[in-house]
Amino acid sequence: MINSVFQGRSFLAEKDFTRAELEYLIGLSAHLKDLKKRNIQHHYLAGKNIALLFEKTSTRTRAAFTTAAIDLGAHPEYLGANDIQLGKKESTEDTAKVLGRMFDGIEFRGFSQRMVEELAEFSGVPVWNGLTDEWHPTQMLADYLTVQENFGRLEGLTLVYCGDGRNNVANSLLVTGAILGVNVHIFSPKELFPEKEIVELAEGFAKESGARVLITEDADEAVKDADVLYTDVWVSMGEEDKFAERVALLKPYQVNMDLVKKAGNENLIFLHCLPAFHDTHTVYGKDVAEKFGVEEMEVTDEVFRSKYARHFDQAENRMHTIKAVMAATLGNLYIPKV
């Protein structure tokens, strides 16, 4: 008899999970969030050891996995870029086989999707994708939990992603939304439209869920009847040399109050996976302002601090949703079907 449909599975990309499974994980996240708020212990991973592999640096992902593991009674061990050899002095396969004998679960945040897939293939333990260049699945659970908390549902809502339409967050929002029945609009310049295969994948899921997929560079078409406006940084990690080009290309796709008003929905919410470059209160922000004359990038400070903003709720939800994924895949919970 199968005790859990999740036990032992890796969480590498949203497309690997059904709508019912993703909805279950979002619901479990809400439950674990409630337990946390009421200070009720939930040590589903007591005695477990979790490896946190970070090829790319992070604030939210590292903090979320660390606190989630501790709340679940597990011991997290951080291994940064200087601590792991993945493909450098030791193959990913060999590293995976070693870590799988020492740890009960592995988180990986890095560049290559193939690398996280190899870790899952050869470690023999659940592997969780904390971000790769292609997908950002743990972010999606937090995003759609935040949307559900604000609207009480997901199906039939419209989420508009503004900016670089070919990055990992755009890919994941598009596919996950299509699976969950959320209309997803990508508002982006043609040069940065999502890859054809990603759009086709999303359209396939949308046919099943009844969702709508729209890729456009027209602001009026993009934000009409929007419930959620979402943006991300204009330059992803590893692409810093393209900054001048991106600023010029993406300035018309900035989330500002004019765009918010264009949506015509006072109940609209704004999301951002963070960090956000909305002012010059950072070394990076000052540098960009000096070099390019831009003091606010993907979102204006006005929108970032407005009544529409939910990004700090969204950031907190990283912890609760990551906790749900780890508990479901490693905690021997009784989930015979969803």
Swiss-Prot record:
According to its record, what are the GO cellular component terms? cytoplasm
Q: Which reaction does it catalyse?
A: carbamoyl phosphate + L-ornithine = L-citrulline + phosphate + H(+)
Q: Please report a single Pfam family linked to this protein.
A: OTCace_N
List of residues binding L-ornithine = N168, D232, S236, M237
Residues of the signal sequence?
none
User: Which top-level group of life is the source organism from?
Assistant: Bacteria
Q: Specify whether Protease is a keyword of the entry.
A: no
Question: What name has this protein been given in UniProt?
Answer: Ornithine carbamoyltransferase
Supply the source organism for this entry.
Streptococcus pneumoniae serotype 19F (strain G54)
